[in-house]
Regions:
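N-terminal secretory signal peptides that target proteins for export/translocation
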Residues: 1-8
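Bacterial N-terminal signal peptides
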Residues: 11-23
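Scaffold/interface architecture of coatomer-like assemblies
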Residues: 27-343
């Protein structure tokens, strides 16, 4: 039977394409893992009175990855470190009572952390029933302040979806997450009534993207709510902290919760100059604390050396210690994911 060489070549080509397609499909079924080559660890050190300890050097720190000490290759403690910071502003009904105060405080925080220099960038996300990227990543803080002035709260609260958006759906700056490093500040009470994402999911996506989360809690007058635990978990797991300005409004005032009044159980009557001054002072002290912490951190970087036992761990835990300082508190991320999520 005669052989048609052209047809034969075509058949071979089809066969090769089919085999190649099979290999591609087979490989596509495997999870795509992108290894983290370097880990960045911002660290805050405070003494037993909450004051920043700012005179430490590289040799004072020890960084452990899965219990194995690491060699720190980059150490930075300059106050002018490049940073990209996301402002996540609660627009739910719960913000209405003190909206004007937090509106003013957020504007102050934006202007302090983004002084119109290229190495400082930020973005603004609001969240009510759903998150919205109001201003994408930019060095222009005045643009964000202008948008902020026109806002009015109302609706539900999609906090977790807002965190997810901050980590995945904005314009990035060349060099992230190392220079600049990534920070998010949540201004809200921690409630979530509308999100599709869960608390666990957004903590993971923040850890994968090396984002440090801070929060300015708007929960009022020292009464703990379960929603505040959301803020605590997000900040502690990523190396940040929660400021609770309204919890301390009455710390220096006798009679709080023991002097009934028609306007409520306040030691300073609502609507008076004293009440307004205490409230504003507490909020702006918290703003100053956040600004100070973000700009005074020690930033360390290392290439993971975890030995055979730590190679395949899906989540690697970090521990940081300092020499000869027993009464200090260290805040840093709890760990990181060495591989990207399955695709």
């Amino acid at each position: 039977m005669p052989v048609n060489f052209r047809t034969g070549r075509a058949w071979c080509a089809v066969a090769l394409i089919s085999v190649a397609a099979f290999v591609i499909v087979a490989r596509a079924q495997e999870p795509i893992r992108v290894e983290v080559r370097d880990v960045i660890v911002p660290v805050t050190v405070t003494d037993d009175k909450g004051r920043f300890v700012s005179n430490l050097e590289k040799n004072d720190f020890h960084v452990f990855d899965e219990g194995r000490e690491q060699k720190v290759t980059v150490f930075n403690h300059q106050q002018s470190q490049p940073i990209v910071i996301g402002f996540l502003l609660d627009q739910s009904n719960g913000m209405k009572i003190h909206w004007a105060k937090y509106q003013e405080a957020t504007s102050e925080l934006m202007l302090n952390l983004l002084p119109l220099e290229k190495k400082y960038s930020g973005y603004l996300i609001t969240y009510g029933n759903e998150p919205e990227l109001v201003v994408d990543t930019s060095s222009d803080s005045e643009k964000m302040v202008e948008k902020l002035r026109k806002m009015k709260p109302g609706g539900g609260s999609a906090l977790f979806d807002a965190i997810y958006m901050a980590c995945t759906s904005r314009k990035t700056i060349k060099g992230e997450p190392y220079e600049p490093r990534r920070v998010v500040v949540v201004i809200g009470d921690g409630h979530d009534t509308s999100s599709k994402k869960t608390l666990k999911e957004v903590i993971e996506v923040a850890q994968r993207n090396l984002v440090t989360i801070y929060a300015l809690s708007t929960a009022a007058f020292g009464f703990h709510t379960d929603a505040e635990d959301n803020l605590v978990q997000m900040t502690e797991q990523t190396g940040g902290k929660v400021e609770t300005p309204l919890n301390n409004v009455y710390k220096d005032i006798s009679g709080y919760l023991s002097k009934p009044s028609d306007a409520g159980n306040y030691a300073i009557d609502v609507g008076t100059g004293g009440y307004t001054a205490e409230l504003s002072s507490a909020i702006f002290r918290s703003i100053a604390n956040l600004s100070g912490e973000i700009t005074t951190q020690y930033v360390m970087r290392y290439t993971p050396d975890v030995g055979e036992k730590g190679v395949d761990r899906q989540f690697r835990r970090i521990r940081v210690t300092v020499n000869n300082l027993p009464n200090v508190t260290l805040r840093y991320r709890s760990g990181y994911y060495p591989f990207g999520p399955p695709q």
